[in-house]
Swiss-Prot record:
Active site: 181 (proton donor/acceptor), 252 (nucleophile)
Reaction catalysed by this enzyme: Hydrolysis of terminal non-reducing N-acetyl-D-hexosamine residues in N-acetyl-beta-D-hexosaminides
Positions marked as site (Important for catalytic activity): 179
Pathway: Cell wall biogenesis; peptidoglycan recycling
Binding site for substrate: 64, 72, 138, 168-169
Annotated keywords: Cell cycle, Cell division, Cell shape, Cell wall biogenesis/degradation, Cytoplasm, Glycosidase, Hydrolase, Peptidoglycan synthesis
Name of the top EC class for this enzyme: hydrolase
Purpose: Plays a role in peptidoglycan recycling by cleaving the terminal beta-1,4-linked N-acetylglucosamine (GlcNAc) from peptide-linked peptidoglycan fragments, giving rise to free GlcNAc, anhydro-N-acetylmuramic acid and anhydro-N-acetylmuramic acid-linked peptides.
Provenance organism: Nitrosospira multiformis (strain ATCC 25196 / NCIMB 11849 / C 71)
Family listed: Belongs to the glycosyl hydrolase 3 family. NagZ subfamily.
Name listed for the protein in its UniProt record: Beta-hexosaminidase
One Pfam family hit: Glyco_hydro_3
Length: 349
C-alpha cells in the first residue's frame, strides 16, 4: 500500500488501538509528533519504530523542531537556539553564522534521525519584520539574502545527517501581525512588493535543492482571493511554474483558523489538494480526522508518491551512543550550546 496524502497526529506517548486503525488507513501517509508524544528518548525511539512497522512502505514521521520556542522534544535533546540568534551573529560575522547554522542543522537532524524521526518542518524562510505575532524570533533575519544564506547552511547540516528540509511559510508570513492559528491574516502588498523581498529566500532555496515547502494560511488579496495554501495561483502558477519548485508541498494544519473559510475538514483537504498540495496536515482534532478518513476521496498521483519518498530520512542513521562518541557531533553541540544564552544563564546541552 503506497503512502496517502494525509498527515495526522496521535494521542499520546504510545500507539492506541484507535491510532493504529487510523494510521493503517490508505489515505494516511505520515504522522506529526508533538510534545505530548514525548516522555524520553527510549520511549520516542520505540514509538517511531512502532509507527514505521505499521505499513510498507513505512509512514513518514515528522515534527516541528526548529529551535527556540518551537522545539517539541527538549529533555535529552540539545537546546537549539532561535534562528534570529544566528541572524544576530550574521550581522557581525557572516562566515561564523553560516558555520553555526550548518552545525545547528546537523545536530537537529542527527538527534531526530537517531530517534527515528524522518524530517522536521524547518527552516523558517519568513522575513523578520518585527511585527508578526507568530514568526518573531523563528525567522533568521530581516535581510532576505541573509535568510537564504543561513537557511542554505542549515539545510546542508540537515542533509549531512540524512534529513530533508521543508521551507515555510511560502510566500512569506512575516509581514503581517495576525497569527493564522487563531485568525485569517491578510497581507495587502502587491505581488511586485512580495517578489522584491519575501520571495527571495524561497527562490534561492529552491535553487539550492529544497525538498519540501509549506505555504502560509495567509490571503494576499492583490494576488489572489484565496490563502496561499489553497491557491492555484500561488502553488501552481508561482511556486511550481515561475519558481520551478519540484519538491513536496505540505499544507499547514487544516485545523487552524486560517483554514476555516474552506469549510469542513473534508472540504479543506479537497481544496488544498486541488490547489496543488501533495500532503495535508490535520492536527489536534480527532473527530475531524475521523471524518476526513471516512469521506475524502483522493488518489495520490505517481509524481506525488515520488515527492513523498524524497522526504524519507536516510536509512541506518547513527545511534545516539555512536553520535555521542563522534567528535564532530560533540564539537557541533559545544558550538551551538551557548548561542543566545544571556549573561547569568546556563546553556542547556
Amino acid at each position: 500500500m503506497s503512502l496517502g496524502p494525509v498527515i495526522l497526529d496521535i494521542e499520546g506517548t504510545q500507539l492506541t488501538a484507535n491510532d493504529k486503525k487510523k494510521l493503517r488507513h490508505p489515505l494516511v501517509g505520515g504522522v506529526i509528533l508533538f510534545t505530548r508524544n514525548y516522555s524520553s528518548l527510549a520511549q520516542l525511539m520505540h514509538l517511531t519504530a512502532e509507527i514505521h512497522a505499521l505499513r510498507t512502505p513505512p509512514l513518514l514521521v515528522a515534527v516541528d523542531h526548529e529551535g527556540g520556542r518551537v522545539q517539541r522534544f527538549r529533555e535529552d535533546f540539545t537546546r537549539l537556539p532561535p534562528m534570529r540568534e544566528l541572524g544576530r551573529i550574521w550581522d557581525e560575522h557572516p562566515a561564523q553564522a553560516r558555520h553555526l547554522a550548518h552545525e545547528a542543522g546537523y545536530v537537529l537532524a542527527a538527534e531526530l534521525r537517531a530517534a527515528g524521526v524522518d524530517f522536521s518542518f524547518t527552516p523558517v524562510l519568513d522575513m523578520d519584520y518585527g511585527q508578526s505575532s507568530v514568526i518573531r524570533d523563528r525567522a533568521f533575519h530581516r535581510d532576505p539574502q541573509a535568510i537564504a544564506e543561513l537557511a542554505h547552511s542549515l539545510m546542508s547540516g540537515l542533509k549531512s545527517a540524512g534529513m530533508a528540509a521543508v521551507g515555510k511559510h511560502f510566500p512569506g508570513h512575516g509581514y503581517i501581525e495576525a497569527d493564522s492559528h487563531f485568525e485569517m491574516p491578510v497581507d495587502e502588498r502587491t505581488y511586485a512588493q512580495i517578489e522584491m523581498d519575501d520571495l527571495i529566500p524561497f527562490r534561492k532555496m529552491i535553487g539550492f535543492g529544497l525538498t519540501g515547502m509549506m505555504p502560509a494560511h495567509v490571503i494576499y488579496p492583490k494576488v489572489d482571493a484565496l490563502p496561499a495554501g489553497f491557491s492555484e495561483v500561488w502553488l501552481k502558477k508561482v511556486l511550481r511554474g515561475e519558481l520551478g519548485f519540484e519538491g513536496c508541498i505540505f499544507s499547514d494544519d487544516l485545523n487552524m483558523a486560517g483554514a476555516a473559510f474552506a469549510g469542513n475538514p473534508v472540504e479543506r483537504a479537497q481544496k488544498a489538494l486541488h490547489a496543488g498540495c501533495d500532503m495535508v496536515l490535520l492536527c489536534n482534532n480527532p473527530e475531524a480526522a475521523e471524518m476526513l478518513l471516512a469521506e475524502l476521496h483522493w488518489d495520490l498521483p505517481a509524481l506525488g508518491v515520488i515527492r513523498l519518498a524524497r522526504m524519507r530520512g536516510r536509512p541506518n542513521p547513527d545511534s545516539l551512543v555512536k553520535l555521542h562518541e563522534n567528535p564532530n557531533f560533540v564539537s557541533a553541540v559545544e558550538k551551538i550550546a551557548g548561542i543566545g544564552v544571556r549573561s547569568g544563564e546556563l546553556p542547556l546541552v
